[in-house]
């Protein structure tokens, strides 16, 4: 009974309104030719051929051309994430390297200060000219030429300090601070000399 009502409710429209009505309902972008309707047999054969050609063209095109922008944006996003991860790894590596360098420098300073304190504990009476070698042990990375320069400079400095300052410095802390000052003076003077 529902089929009979559907058949009765269907009314055919004149061909001019069919063509105009089909223009509004069309999803295909091909224009109508001279008012022919969408259901005419002339257009149906051409449309089937065009549709099959378009699908095969799309398949061939997908093999030749790069993927659509959506896939490209995913790969670009993946690439950016990898670059950020590498940057993060590089930053962590650099901070770890700086930390290890600082630890190594602090250990070398502690060892040098222990050597200076030990040297001052042995020789508390005088600061003689033979002692500049202990300062050279604090700076183990110097080249041979720099060590000779340091030794000569320290001998002159200690000879002068022996007369002026060392007799007035009674505590080991004062002597240690003076050693720090001498080391800084030597490092600064060596940088100016070799640059």
UniProtKB/Swiss-Prot annotation:
**Which GO MF terms does the UniProt record name?**
protein serine/threonine phosphatase inhibitor activity
The similarity annotation says: Belongs to the FAM122 family.
- The name of this protein is PABIR family member 1
């Amino acid at each position: 009974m529902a089929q009979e009502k559907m058949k009765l409710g269907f009314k055919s429209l004149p061909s001019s309104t069919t063509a105009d009505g089909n223009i509004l309902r069309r999803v295909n972008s091909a224009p109508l030719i001279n008012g022919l309707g969408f259901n005419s047999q002339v257009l149906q054969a051409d449309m089937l051929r065009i549709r099959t050609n378009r699908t095969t063209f799309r398949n061939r095109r997908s093999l030749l051309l790069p993927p659509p922008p959506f896939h490209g944006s995913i790969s670009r996003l993946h690439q950016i994430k990898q670059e950020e991860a590498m940057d993060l790894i590089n930053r962590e590596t650099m901070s770890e390297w700086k930390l290890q360098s600082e630890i190594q420098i602090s250990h070398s300073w502690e060892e040098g200060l222990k050597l200076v304190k030990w040297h001052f504990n042995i020789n508390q009476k005088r600061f003689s000219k033979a002692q500049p070698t202990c300062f050279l042990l604090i700076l183990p990375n110097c080249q041979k030429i720099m060590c000779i320069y340091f030794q000569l400079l320290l001998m002159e400095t200690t000879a002068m300090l022996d007369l002026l300052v060392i007799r007035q410095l009674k505590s080991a802390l004062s002597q240690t601070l003076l050693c720090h000052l001498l080391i800084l003076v030597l490092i600064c003077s060596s940088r100016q000399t070799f640059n």
